[in-house]
C-alpha cells in the first residue's frame, strides 16, 4: 500500500470521525496532502457543518472549491474539533508540524478547538521528536539573531527556500520561502526533543520568532493512524 492510499484511508476515517459531531457545528481544517484527502472525503457531507475555519490560503481555496463555507477565525469563539496531519507525532501526542509552512495559522486554529484530531500514516509515529527538521516561523529582519539563538540548541539551522514561483508573494525558487503571513522559516535539523513543552516555550520566547512548529501545548487528543492493516484510533 503506497503513501497516497494510506492518506486516503485516514482521510476517510477522519470524515467518519467528524460526522459523529452534531449537525450545524463549525470545523477547523488543517493544511497539507493528508488534510486535502480529508477535505475531499468530507465534501459530499459539507451541509452537515455550518462552516469551517481554515489554516491556510491553500486550504481555503480547496474548501471553497468544494462548496464549504469558510469563516474568519475572528468571528468564531471555539471549535468542537480541528483536523490536521503531522510531520512527526510522539506517544504523548506532541507533534512537529509546519513542513508545508502553515504552522502559525495551524497553531492558532488548533488553540480554538476542543479537540485536535491528528491524521497520519504510521511512518509519522516516532518515540522522540526531532528526526524531521523543526520549523520556526520568523520575522525576516530577525533572521540573524534568531539563527544564533537556535544554534545554541545544538541543531543545524537553515533558511527554507522557495521550491516554486508564487507571484502573489513575489516569491521565486532559490529565494526565501514566504509564508501566508509574510514570514520566513528556519528549519532546525538534528535535534532530539525529549521535552517538547520546554523547547516550545524556549523557542517562542526568542525575539523575532512568530511561532515554532512544536505542537506540545496544543497536542493531539485523538490520533487516527493508517497502516497496511487499516486505521487505528488512539486516544491520547
From Swiss-Prot:
A GO molecular-function annotation: ribose-5-phosphate isomerase activity
Binding site for substrate: 31-34, 84-87, 97-100, 124
Residues spanning the membrane: none
Pathway stated in the Swiss-Prot or TrEMBL entry: Carbohydrate degradation; pentose phosphate pathway; D-ribose 5-phosphate from D-ribulose 5-phosphate (non-oxidative stage): step 1/1
Record carries keyword Signal: no
PANTHER family tied to this protein: RIBOSE-5-PHOSPHATE ISOMERASE
Name used for this protein in its record: Ribose-5-phosphate isomerase A
Organism the protein comes from: Polynucleobacter asymbioticus (strain DSM 18221 / CIP 109841 / QLW-P1DMWA-1)
Amino acid at each position: 500500500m503506497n503513501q497516497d492510499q494510506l492518506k486516503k484511508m485516514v482521510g476517510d476515517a477522519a470524515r467518519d470521525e467528524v460526522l459523529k459531531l452534531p449537525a450545524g457545528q463549525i470545523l477547523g481544517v488543517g493544511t497539507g496532502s493528508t488534510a486535502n484527502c480529508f477535505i475531499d472525503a468530507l465534501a459530499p457531507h459539507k451541509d452537515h457543518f455550518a462552516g469551517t475555519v481554515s489554516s491556510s490560503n491553500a486550504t481555503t481555496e480547496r474548501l471553497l472549491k468544494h462548496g464549504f463555507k469558510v469563516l474568519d477565525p475572528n468571528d468564531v469563539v471555539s471549535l468542537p474539533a480541528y483536523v490536521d496531519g503531522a510531520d512527526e507525532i510522539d506517544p504523548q501526542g506532541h507533534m512537529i508540524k509546519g513542513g508545508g509552512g502553515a504552522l502559525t495559522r495551524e497553531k492558532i486554529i488548533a488553540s480554538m478547538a476542543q479537540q485536535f484530531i491528528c491524521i497520519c500514516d504510521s511512518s509519522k509515529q516516532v518515540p522522540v521528536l526531532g528526526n524531521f527538521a523543526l520549523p520556526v516561523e520568523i520575522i525576516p529582519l530577525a533572521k540573524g539573531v534568531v539563527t544564533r539563538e537556535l544554534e545554541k540548541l545544538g541543531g543545524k539551522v537553515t533558511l527554507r527556500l522557495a521550491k516554486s514561483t508564487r507571484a502573489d508573494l513575489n516569491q521565486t525558487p532559490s529565494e526565501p520561502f514566504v509564508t501566508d503571513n509574510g514570514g520566513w522559516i528556519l528549519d532546525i535539523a538534528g535535534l532530539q526533543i525529549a521535552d517538547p513543552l520546554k523547547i516550545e516555550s524556549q523557542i517562542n520566547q526568542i525575539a523575532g520568532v512568530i511561532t515554532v512548529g512544536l505542537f506540545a501545548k496544543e497536542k493531539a487528543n485523538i490520533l487516527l493512524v493508517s497502516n497496511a492493516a487499516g486505521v487505528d484510533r488512539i486516544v491520547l
